[in-house]
Amino acid sequence: MNYTTALPDFIEMQRVSFCWFIAQGLNEELNTFSRIYDFSQNTEYVLFGQEYSLVKPIYNIVRAKKYTANYSAQLVIPLEVRNKKTNIIKYHSKFPIINLPLMTSSATFVINGCERVIVSQIIRSPGVYFEKNKHQKKNKKIRKLISSEIGKLKSFTPPSEILPTESRLYFLKPTIKKKLISDKKKKIRFIKKEEYWNWKGESLNIYSFKQIKDYEIDFSTSFVEHFKVYNDLFKIRHLSTKIKRIKIFLKWLACNNKFSLPNKKHLIFLLINSFNLLSRTIVKYKILKTRNNENKNDFILNDYNQIKKVYDQVLQESETLLSLNINTQILSFILRDLEKFNQLNNFNFLKLNITPKIKVIIANDKIKSSLYFTNSFKELIKFKYNFTKKEKDKKRNQSQATIFKNKTKYLKTKSKIIQYKDDHLIRDIYKKKYEEKELYTATLIPEYGSWIRFGFQKNTKINISKYPIKNQEDEIIIQLDKVTQKPIIHLLKEMGVTDLEICQNLQNSEFFYFNKPILTNSIHQPNKLLRFNLNKNYYKNISEFSRIFDPSYYRLGKIGRSKLNNRLDINLSKRITTITYEDIFAIIDKLITLSTAKQISDDIDHLKNRRVRSVGELLQNLFRIGFQRLLRKLRSQTNKTYSSQLSSFNIVGATIKEFFGASQLSQYMDQTNPLSSLTHRRRISGLGPGGFDRDRISFAVRDIHPSHYGRICPIETPEGQNVGLIASLTTCARVNESGFLETPFWRVINGKVIKNRNPIYLTADIEDFYKIAPADISTNQENYLTKNLIPVRYKQDFLTVTPSEVDFIAVSPIQVVSVAASLIPFFEHDDANRALMGSNMQRQSVPLLLPQKPIVGTGLENQIALDSGMVINAQRAGIVESVTANKIIILEDSGRHYKYDLQKYQRSNQETCINHRPIVWEGEKVKSGQMLTDGPGIISSELSLGQNVLVAYMPWQGYNFEDAILINERLVYEDIFTSIHIERYEIEIDRTAEMSEQTTNNIPNLSISDVQNLNEDGIVTIGTFVKPGDILVGKIIPKDDSEQLPESKLLRAIFGAKAKGVRDTSFRMPEGEYGRVIETLTFNRRTKLAYKFEKIQIFIAQIRKIQVGDKIAGRHGNKGIISRILPRQDMPFLPDGTPVDIILNPLGVPSRMNVGQLYECLLGLAGHKLNRRFKILPFDEMYGPEVSRILINKKLRQASIENDEAWLFNPYSPGKMVLLDGRTGKEFDNPITVGNAYMLKLIHLVDDKMHSRATGPYSLVTQQPLGGKAQHGGQRFGEMEVWALEGFGASFTLKELLTIKSDDMQGRNETLNSIIKGQPIPTSGVPESFKVLVQELRSIGLDLSTYRIDEFSSNQSYEIELNLIEKYNPLLKTFSHTSNINNISF
């Protein structure tokens, strides 16, 4: 077996998918909806889905196409309707639910007589994907000037609000035990139930008492605490509360700073830095106290300047201050009473004599340290007591009573204290682990249901007392759409999961829980949890988020389950297709792990994360939607009769009809030629329901991905806005049962390619784990790799390894590209953009009358012709018994006769001609699957889309400027580029109740020659050649009496004339169309007396020769328009006298970089001279460097020797030859590249584009002529054309174009009238588009008025307002007189 040409069945994907749907998919859906209940739950509909049957179609495929019907089978299911209360069966019978369109053997559907294709869809695979947030704000580090402690403090304190409100001021009960820790410099007591700790020390990474003992700790007042408190006091708007709060704060501050502490230089430095903020607060407070002052502004300015001056001075002297041993703190000035404070004229406390003053203040101040000002619940509750040796015993006796007595001094309510155990202190690991995390988002894509997102979110609404975790800025939320979201723990608790369960199921539980939750509802404590101390009533109402666990709303499917198991390392059964708690826990864990480990997020464009939904699965989803609609309809119907309820089953059929008729994925089949129809069925679309939206999609999705190798073609994709969203399957790719794309490879073991078995198909995710060599690696006869170093792909990267390390090798060089691209010879020498155009333009090639097989091909032509569906293949082996133009009869081995009907001159969807020509003869033995006929663009079993013509690359009198093409008249006379096009005209007979049209050949006021080609029924006879204006169907309609004048009625009454007049409403051939009638079809409706025509179809065949304006192209993206047809004698000719057929511009090659066309035309010339054809596979470097060039040179040399024509090969300029000018007979100056290229005629024919308009329809709103040939529109005089006229100053021409020739309604009517009467053309008015603009501006609230400016005179206004919109004077409110002329509208 030659492995390079052994390709799979090209439309296997579609056929297998539909067969799966009929056999299995349909069954699955019918089982899901086997029992349906109505609204009252009394009536039950039982569908016996296992026993469904398909009734044979009424029309076969040929008849369905001919009579514009559907090729569909009736789906019949036994249905039972019974009343549940009474248990009475109302109905039990086989019920026809829908007409299911059936797939033809060539993977198409016949809907309304047209062949349609269901394009496969590529979508994101169900599963979970983790993505790094693109716009993550990085935490800004505080400048190092403020010392390293600030960074620690910042990460340590929460970002939430800190206000001295009741709920955040906490006290101790008198029963608490005490423990003393001695220190050399001072004694500090820690109050401890199970554990307490004062976090205000300088070493912020200490979390246990053991560590405290090892350090000498100074429990000084924290700057951050002051800073945060002041910051929040600023935010209070209500003045009286602000004053109260500041008072409380000042008193508390006084308590905390009672004792002078040893000097700490960094502390002073920190406080100096915060001084600016504090000074502003003081000024504000002063203003509050003195707000009745008259000279308030002066006071503020004066005072602020004074403070600012001091502040600046302090900054300057900071170094001096730090060098002195100041045993104090700068903040102590706030300790004074506010009255005293206001009296201070200068800041004496900054001087060195501050210590005695502090002592005085302390002596006067009687406030005890009864108030603890906490930042949030998350800090460990602490109180600080300082003792001297003398006071120790006295204080010990009094302290408990004092605390208890004073604890409610400033509070109205009591607050509970949350207690902790020693062994569950916040650990250093938490801070290290989550401080530097990166934010990720997880997206869970179910097979059915909306996407679910999990992500980190800053908790802005956090209630401090309920969230006591250090550094907990983010929480994980679950999001169903852009609006609905909630914290994930809320959802789990809603569903009844206890905290202990949550904590035990999460590996990263410390992200949520700062100690291990004890069982809830404990006797001693209502809730041991720290973070989720929420009101229990909150969990009583279950939200819509609980739906994610409901299979009727969200379903993962088998694929989603296996993907989830693999990605999250969980081991759930594949039968569990719903989302479970275990999935949620695993996703949370993975999300936290990724954010801390900072791993690479998933590549959503990798093919392992995208799957293909073929016809079968799309239809299965459609059935599900249909049955769900039925369910809703039956449940919404109450008190309906049972027969009307049965009729509501039609909704399923309507859903199917809607999909085949209107869905983005159901497309009108491209039948231009066999290749276009084949590639259309192999197309993969990213658009459609559940897919991408082409307006919002990024470049990353459209781009080529390494995993596309051998699965999706990197070349064939549309140009324009769909680029990259619509792709094509490669030649060898197939879709596996899960919907993932696979491609074949040969196994390589120890450097030997194993080819004796079938190739191994690998999916994209498995392929990443192996080292895979490309197909263009040469092997010897024993299939061993010959090179020492082999380039391989491994994990989407390129490596070079030894042959023994290679695991797989690609099957074929054309494995990478699609069917259309694989037809381009030498395409490795073309730029990718041009190869893309080449593969797209081959699909637009028109099947020619006399096509030729390409001299230079690639070897796929036969396979494409076979799988295209445009030829007839033998169903079984046998012997041909008879062959005619219309049918082939084969005697099978079993003795049965099998008749094959050939299509003769049938119209395709693109109006090209489908015609079968038999290629077998009587008595020939045929095998199963063998081609019996040729089709359009197929000659002797090979795809032949164009013609081999002699091409020269040279300029010729400027006629090939800008890709224009010169052709020889031989191409016209010898019908080389002639094609047949079949057009269908549909004429409907109007049969209204009063006046019915009749078809007849007896039409009044026509000569015999006008009606001689009509039959008795008035229909044109087959074989007639019709020209524009010829009658196709003769129709008349009787004139109504009401239309007649009274005089004629009187005359009829006097003379007794009974005959009424008739009006001619015949259908005539449109302008610019011509051709021969090849078929007429009539659609009848039987009445009591006779058949009456309802609709008549007439098929007309045109033979179109090539002409100026037609588009032709090569296979390498070298397209052009024919600019001139030259006589043979004027064309340049070869030394042997052969004139060139086509002249192309040589400038089209270097900039386009499609050098493949030169290789093709030169090898084509050699093949033409040697009478030999070549099949060239791409990527020839495997045989040696520059093999293509060597092959061509050798073949040209061989041709020149065999034909004894030395001019064919010049070793000094190979491929170029001397040409002679046909007009003069002289040689051209330089040798010219000449060769046989394969050229295609494209469907963009000038006959279809030619269009003219005199008068025609106008747009309703703008009153401008419509655009386009279909609307009989005009040519748009666009912006650039207006610039051209403006540049020449042609103002009158411009005015004419913008008004009377366009949208000045009154002006154009008056102009026509004056032209008819021979009067001068009147002045133009205001264009309608200007009026529309005025109205649009008014609709958004801008009143734009228009004025007429008259000659200036002092006694009257020279500006008169005009109303352009309505024809009346707005001042008089009376309608103005309209023009005398009659309005003539077109």
Curated annotation (Swiss-Prot):
GO terms for molecular function: DNA binding; DNA-directed RNA polymerase activity; ribonucleoside binding. DNA-dependent RNA polymerase catalyzes the transcription of DNA into RNA using the four ribonucleoside triphosphates as substrates. This is DNA-directed RNA polymerase subunit beta. The keyword Protein biosynthesis does not apply. Gene3D superfamilies: 2.40.50.100, 2.40.50.150, 3.90.1100.10, DNA-directed RNA polymerase, beta subunit, external 1 domain, DNA-directed RNA polymerase, subunit 2, domain 6, RNA polymerase alpha subunit dimerisation domain, RNA polymerase Rpb2, domain 2. It comes from the Eukaryota. The lineage of its organism: Eukaryota, Sar, Stramenopiles, Ochrophyta, Bacillariophyta. The keyword Transcription applies. It is an enzyme of class 2 (transferase). Pfam families: RNA_pol_Rpb2_1 (PF04563), RNA_pol_Rpb2_2 (PF04561), RNA_pol_Rpb2_3 (PF04565), RNA_pol_Rpb2_45 (PF10385), RNA_pol_Rpb2_6 (PF00562), RNA_pol_Rpb2_7 (PF04560). Its EC number is 2.7.7.6. Keywords: Chloroplast, DNA-directed RNA polymerase, Nucleotidyltransferase, Plastid, Transcription, Transferase. It is found in: Plastid, Chloroplast. It catalyses: RNA(n) + a ribonucleoside 5'-triphosphate = RNA(n+1) + diphosphate. In plastids the minimal PEP RNA polymerase catalytic core is composed of four subunits: alpha, beta, beta', and beta''. When a (nuclear-encoded) sigma factor is associated with the core the holoenzyme is formed, which can initiate transcription. One of its GO terms (biological process) is DNA-templated transcription. One of its GO terms (cellular component) is mitochondrion. Belongs to the RNA polymerase beta chain family.
